[in-house]
């Protein structure tokens, strides 16, 4: 059994680690709430643009934006959004597994893939597999700006416009709640039909006068919508990261508390054994006299 002094040193070390994990848990909780606010604020903007796009695309007879035209799919581009930092449980691992499974399914259909990567964890992971990476970005921080994301996104959209790829998807962790984050791979372009499109057809029987013409408006709205979708995915992933880190750090703090209790028990036993030995030596010495 280790000596009492050595055990006491271990207890102090674990207590120091516990303070760090507790602080990280509190920081993650605060950041998660702020990110949730940004997530909630940006969602109505994205949903409204989507509804307007649906209406304008139907009004613009004879014109189909490239982002609305479906074709035979032979190559797909995927924007993968991961974290820059670790200590967030299996968040990135689950996302990478989901993405790789989707890529495998496409490969079985003779569909190849190009990647655009956001987040240092995804960059290091997918580079090791030898994928064709068209663009990458890391170091976004806790308050990402849309201007930083546009570069990687435009790499994919330009490839789509030029016919190098036939569809663009985005993979990220969708924030469900504090205890649940779901890895998803969803289509960006060609723009999939929204569930609300048919509902809008039934509810809106009127038309609008467009300035400028519907074509120019549709071109602008589609770009804004796709940018908002990418921003929303990044913010969703950030909220998921902070939630996962909060849960992981809470578990680490609780485990540290349990370990401290176990070490204190061992320390008390070692101290008791030491006192018993000293008493035995005193009794033996007295008996010898």
Swiss-Prot record:
Alphabetized GO MF terms: ATP binding; proton-transporting ATP synthase activity, rotational mechanism
Membrane topology designation: Peripheral membrane protein
UniProt-listed GO biological process terms: proton motive force-driven plasma membrane ATP synthesis
Cross-referenced Pfam families: ATP-synt (PF00231)
Oligomer and partners: F-type ATPases have 2 components, CF(1) - the catalytic core - and CF(0) - the membrane proton channel. CF(1) has five subunits: alpha(3), beta(3), gamma(1), delta(1), epsilon(1). CF(0) has three main subunits: a, b and c.
Iron-sulfur is among the record's keywords: no
Domain of life: Bacteria
Organism, scientific name: Haemophilus influenzae (strain 86-028NP)
Protein name: ATP synthase gamma chain
InterPro entries named in the record: ATP_synth_F1_ATPase_gsu, ATP_synth_F1_gsu, ATP_synth_F1_gsu_CS
Keyword Ion transport: yes
Subcellular location: Cell inner membrane
């Amino acid at each position: 059994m280790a000596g009492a002094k050595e055990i006491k040193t271990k207890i102090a070390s674990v207590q120091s680690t516990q303070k760090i994990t507790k602080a990280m848990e509190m920081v993650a909780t605060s950041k998660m709430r702020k990110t949730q606010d940004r997530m909630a604020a940006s969602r109505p903007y994205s949903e409204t643009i989507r509804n307007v796009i649906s209406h304008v695309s139907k009004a613009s007879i004879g014109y189909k934006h490239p982002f609305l035209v479906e074709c035979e799919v032979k190559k797909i581009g995927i924007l993968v959004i991961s974290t820059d930092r670790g200590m967030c449980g299996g968040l990135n691992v689950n996302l990478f597994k989901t993405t790789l499974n989707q890529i495998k399914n496409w490969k079985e259909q003779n569909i190849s893939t190009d990647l655009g990567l956001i987040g240092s964890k995804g960059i290091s992971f997918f580079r090791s597999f030898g994928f064709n990476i068209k663009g990458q970005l890391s170091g976004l921080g806790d308050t990402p700006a849309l201007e930083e994301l546009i570069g990687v996104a435009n790499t994919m959209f330009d490839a789509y416009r030029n016919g190098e790829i036939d569809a663009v998807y985005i993979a990220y962790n969708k924030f469900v709640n504090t205890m649940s984050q779901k890895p998803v791979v969803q289509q960006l372009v060609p723009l999939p039909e929204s569930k609300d499109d048919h509902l809008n057809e039934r509810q809106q029987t009127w038309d609008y006068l467009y300035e400028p013409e519907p074509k120019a408006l549709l071109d602008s709205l589609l770009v804004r919508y796709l940018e908002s979708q990418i921003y929303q995915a990044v913010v969703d992933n950030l909220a998921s990261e902070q939630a996962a880190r909060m849960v992981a750090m809470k578990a680490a703090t609780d485990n540290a508390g349990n370990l401290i209790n176990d070490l204190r028990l061992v320390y008390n036993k070692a101290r008791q054994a030491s006192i018993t030995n000293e008493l035995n030596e005193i009794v033996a010495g007295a008996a010898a006299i």
